[in-house]
Amino acid sequence: MASTGSQASDIDKILGFFSDGAPPTKKPRKLLPSLKTKKPRELVLVIGTGISAAVAPQVPALKSWKGLIQALLDAAIDFDLLEDEESKKFQKCLHEDKNLVHVAHDLIQKLSPRTSNVRSTFFKDCLYEVFDDLESKMEDSGKQLLQSVLHLMENGALVLTTNFDNLLELYAADQGKQLESLDLTDEKKVLEWAQEKRKLSVLHIHGVYTNPSGIVLHPAGYQNVLRNTEVMREIQKLYENKSFLFLGCGWTVDDTTFQALFLEAVKHKSDLEHFMLVRRGDVDEFKKLRENMLDKGIKVISYGNDYADLPEYFKRLTCEISTRGRSAGIVREGQLNGSSTAHSEIRDHST
């Protein structure tokens, strides 16, 4: 019997199965040395639609610009705010993939008749309908992503997003932590954020749905910031002196708002060191993206072949970076303790 048990044990080892019969996990993607050696305070996290879509995949408005406009249009139709001909016109534009910024602008204008007071418009109602009850729609794997972002924030990383939602702020509140949502209408706060005086604030460069009057779809919408040389100088210094880490962003660097804020006045971009985490996906597309981004000083890194690989990869990266930030100037023993603490904190919050 003992021999049979031993043989079974050997077979189990050969097959690589654990005691519960589960198959072995695939080998995790290695962390890039030039990224994992960063400290949190050296990073600016850029959160794109891919993160929101991963956190609450059942909300179509979080997945893309087109999804958001369609959701706003559906809400407007449900509230009987558009004539039949108007709704057909907007649907046709969406179906034909017309300039989405222009479509969104026209829809907002239609929902904001003859007034600049957003409180008296229907646009606000439609926004709140689209983003209603986001807390209940977050999935656990998405919460793990948000916990990693929050952990880096608390250790000194800055965070900006192109998204209109406040998923990160909602998650933080659920953890008993208060984050502030900023938009480009408040120059003073934007300046303080860029100067690292408001580290627990999230800068929404397109605005956030809880403040409809701060939503901008085009650089013309925040000329106050673009004309403020002090604010722009501080913002551009971030791109020159820190490492931006793009999460769920894809082609965010082609976004006109992002370009106006960070790229247009920055010279020698290829000498900088920024990072973009993306799914490996199509080999040719991945190669093309990597080549294009290098000219902008951005290293494109694959976190895996599947979207589901991102939470675990980013968790490992966060633990590594947080350890280095916490143990700067501390003996090696302190580094090991810090690593254990970082893993423990993230694990505790994500359960």
Swiss-Prot record:
InterPro entries, per the entry: FAM118 (IPR038916)
Family: Belongs to the FAM118 family.
Major localization listed first in the record, in broad terms: nucleus
Gene Ontology CC annotation, any one: Cajal body
Residues with N-acetylalanine modification: 2
Compartments reported by the entry: Nucleus, Cajal body
Protein's name in the database: Protein FAM118B
Organism encoding this protein: Bos taurus
Gene it is expressed from: FAM118B
Source species, domain of life: Eukaryota
In-chain residues carrying the UniProt-annotated modification Phosphoserine: 9
This protein's UniProt keywords: Acetylation, Nucleus, Phosphoprotein
Function, in words: May play a role in Cajal bodies formation.
